Design a protein with these regions (language model features):
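Intrinsically disordered, low-complexity Ser/Thr/Pro/Gly-rich regulatory segments
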Residues: 1-77, 82-256
Length: 256
């Protein structure tokens, strides 16, 4: 009996395969053309992921770069912010940056071209804590926005990094995606990190019915995208309390 093809699964995997191939081609161009300008490489790296997310996420979610604000604080610059503009538009929208209320944020990304130090990943925990604390102090919803560290290349062992993260007292990063190695996820109880090694999967280096060969980076991106879509489905954003903001802002502006 001929095996029936699941077209949804086939085209889903093929779409991610094409997207990651496009990303890798663009990355190689960046490495060649911007070899002497690390700042430019970083911005281009953010732009590549930004483009992928804008193409692959539902229209409910808007993808921007900028700052997150609540009643009392403004975050440091966030590389990529996924926010629900249907709930509330940005408080400020400039040529390249926005300021969005924490109430509408679904995910914040820290994007790195390369990240090799365990200490650097632990530093990312501090950045994630800022966003999580802003949400806790301002939003009624229990489910916090995601914080993801997305890395294109890293000279670290995924297993050792998992151990370092679990030995730390911090549990603020939800996911670390390293395209060339795999992923590290925070479990649903927010108590422990566990790693996903693409090299351990049977599908790697096998040829598909569509003619292309599945590489480790394809499996990493398929897992990352599936995780992101599922997690965003469970995040409930809300409209900020504009009446309260109005009263407090007028009080401060008029120095009452």
């Amino acid at each position: 009996m001929t095996k029936k093809t699941n077209f949804a699964n086939t085209f889903f995997a093929s779409s991610i395969h094409n997207a990651i191939d496009k990303i890798m081609v663009e990355l190689e161009l960046i490495r060649r053309l911007a070899n002497q300008h690390s700042g430019e490489k970083g911005r281009e790296a953010e732009g590549i992921l930004n483009g992928f997310l804008k193409t692959m996420l539902p229209n409910k979610w808007t993808v921007d770069t900028g700052f997150i604000i609540n009643e009392n604080n403004v975050s440091p610059q966030v590389d990529i912010i996924i926010h629900n503009q249907l709930e509330a538009p940005p408080i400020y929208s400039g040529y390249s940056h926005v300021i969005v209320p924490i109430h509408t944020v679904g995910c914040a990304f820290e994007v790195k071209m390369q990240l090799n130090s365990h200490l650097a990943y632990l530093k990312c925990q501090e950045n994630a804590k800022i966003i999580k604390d802003m949400h806790t102090s301002s939003v009624n919803k229990k489910q916090q926005p995601l914080y993801i560290v997305f890395v294109y290349s890293a000279n670290v062992d995924l297993g050792n990094l998992e151990i370092k993260l679990n030995n730390s007292e911090h549990r603020h990063i939800d996911c670390i995606c390293i395209i060339e190695k795999g992923l590290i996820f925070l479990n649903s109880h927010k108590s422990k990190y566990f790693s996903f090694h693409a090299s351990s999967l049977n599908e790697v280096n096998k040829k598909t019915i569509l003619g292309y060969t599945i590489k480790e980076k394809h499996m990493v991106m398929i897992e990352f995208y599936a995780y992101l879509m599922h997690a965003l489905q469970n995040i409930k954003t809300e409209v900020p309390d504009y009446h309260s903001w109005k009263d407090e802002s007028l009080t401060e502006l008029l120095n009452i």
